[in-house]
C-alpha cells in the first residue's frame, strides 16, 4: 500500500513513491518485465548470431540498481543484457548517449575489465543523478574501463560529435569488443523539457552513423526523452539508418493518425515552432532529405525489432524471472 503519505516503508525502501520519480502504476511489474524481457531476447539474438542489429526502443532503463528503482527505471535491462552476453563469452562495449549519466550500468561493471562503459551526458553538476564525473573510472581490475564525458549545458551538435570522434572511437577500437550495446536516449535533444543539451536531429544521426560504422554486432536500446515528438522522430530515423533506409521528410498522411490509440480522432495539425538552432521543428526537418525506399534493408545486415509475440514464444520472460544465475545481484 503506497497511498499513505505518498509512500509506504517498503515502497520507499525500493525506490517507489507516488510523489517521486518512480511512481507505482497498474501492472507496473508486467510492463517492466516485458521491456526487460525484450532486451534479453534481443541479446539472445545477438549472442547466437541470429541477428547483426537489434533495436528495442522500450529498453535502455539505465538507472535501476540491484535493490531499488531509480530515475523512472524499474529493472536495469542494459546491465542484464551485458551480463547475459558476458556469460556467452562476449566482451561488451556499452555506450550511453542519454542526457542523464548511465549510473546503474556503470556501477554494475565498475570492477570488470570485460565491459567498457562510456557515458556522454549533461554534467551531474546540473542534472540527475548527480554522478558521471571524469574521475569515476573503475575499480581493479576494471580501472580505466568506466569512461565518463560530462558536458556543459547547451552543448550542441559540433562539440558533441567532435567529442564522440575524439574520445569514444579510439577507446572502442583499442578495447576491441565483440558486441556493441548503445543506449539512445533522446533527452539530449534541444527541445527536451527536462535537460539542457542542444542536439538536433543532425547531431543525433551523426552519432548513429558513427555507431553503424563500427561494424560490430549491435544491440540498440531506447532510453530517456520527454519531448514525445522528438523521440518518435529520432528513433524512427535511427531505425532507418541502422538498416540502410532513407526516410522522407514528411510523414505519409495515412500514417499520421495511429490505429489503436487515443490519437485516432485527433485532428491532424502541423504546429511550426521556430527554434534557437535556426530551423523549423515541426516534424519536417530540412536537415533530412531523400525518399523512402520500399524494397527493404540495403545495408546487408540482418535486423530485428523484437515484439511481444516473439518474446513470449521464446519463453524468455519465464527464463528471466526464474533463472537464479541470470538474476544474481539484480
For every predicted segment, state its role.
Residues 5-330:
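A general "terminal functional-core" signal
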Amino acid at each position: 500500500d503506497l497511498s499513505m503519505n505518498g509512500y509506504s516503508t517498503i515502497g520507499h525502501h525500493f525506490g517507489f513513491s507516488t510523489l517521486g520519480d518512480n511512481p507505482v502504476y497498474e501492472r507496473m511489474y508486467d510492463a517492466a518485465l516485458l521491456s526487460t524481457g525484450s532486451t534479453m531476447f534481443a541479446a539472445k539474438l545477438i549472442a547466437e548470431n541470429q541477428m547483426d542489429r537489434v533495436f528495442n526502443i522500450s529498453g535502455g532503463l539505465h538507472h535501476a540498481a540491484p535493490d531499488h528503482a531509480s530515475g523512472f527505471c524499474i529493472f536495469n535491462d542494459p546491465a542484464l543484457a551485458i551480463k547475459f552476453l558476458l556469460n556467452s563469452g562476449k566482451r561488451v562495449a556499452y555506450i550511453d548517449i542519454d542526457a542523464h549519466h548511465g549510473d546503474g550500468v556503470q556501477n554494475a561493471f565498475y570492477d570488470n575489465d570485460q565491459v567498457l562503459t562510456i557515458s556522454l551526458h549533461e554534467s551531474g553538476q546540473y542534472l540527475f543523478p548527480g554522478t558521471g564525473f571524469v574521475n569515476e573510472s573503475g575499480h581493479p581490475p576494471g580501472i580505466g574501463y568506466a569512461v565518463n564525458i560530462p558536458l556543459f549545458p547547451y552543448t550542441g551538435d559540433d562539440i558533441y560529435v567532435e567529442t564522440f570522434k575524439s574520445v569514444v572511437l579510439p577507446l572502442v577500437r583499442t578495447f576491441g569488443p565483440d558486441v556493441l550495446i548503445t543506449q539512445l536516449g533522446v533527452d539530449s535533444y534541444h527541445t527536451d523539457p527536462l535537460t539542457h543539451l542542444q542536439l538536433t536531429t543532425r547531431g543525433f544521426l551523426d552519432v548513429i552513423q558513427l555507431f553503424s560504422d563500427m561494424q560490430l554486432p549491435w544491440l540498440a536500446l531506447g532510453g530517456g526523452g520527454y519531448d514525445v515528438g522528438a523521440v518518435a522522430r529520432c528513433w524512427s530515423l535511427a531505425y532507418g539508418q541502422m538498416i540502410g533506409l532513407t526516410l522522407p521528410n514528411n510523414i505519409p498522411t495515412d500514417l499520421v493518425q495511429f490505429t489503436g490509440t487515443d490519437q485516432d480522432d485527433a485532428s491532424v495539425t502541423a504546429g511550426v515552432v521556430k527554434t534557437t538552432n535556426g530551423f523549423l521543428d515541426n516534424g519536417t526537418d530540412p536537415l533530412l532529405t531523400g525518399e523512402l525506399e520500399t524494397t527493404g534493408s540495403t545495408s546487408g545486415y540482418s535486423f530485428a525489432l523484437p515484439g511481444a509475440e516473439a518474446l513470449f514464444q521464446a519463453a524468455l520472460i519465464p527464463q528471466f524471472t526464474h533463472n537464479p544465475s541470470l538474476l544474481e545481484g539484480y
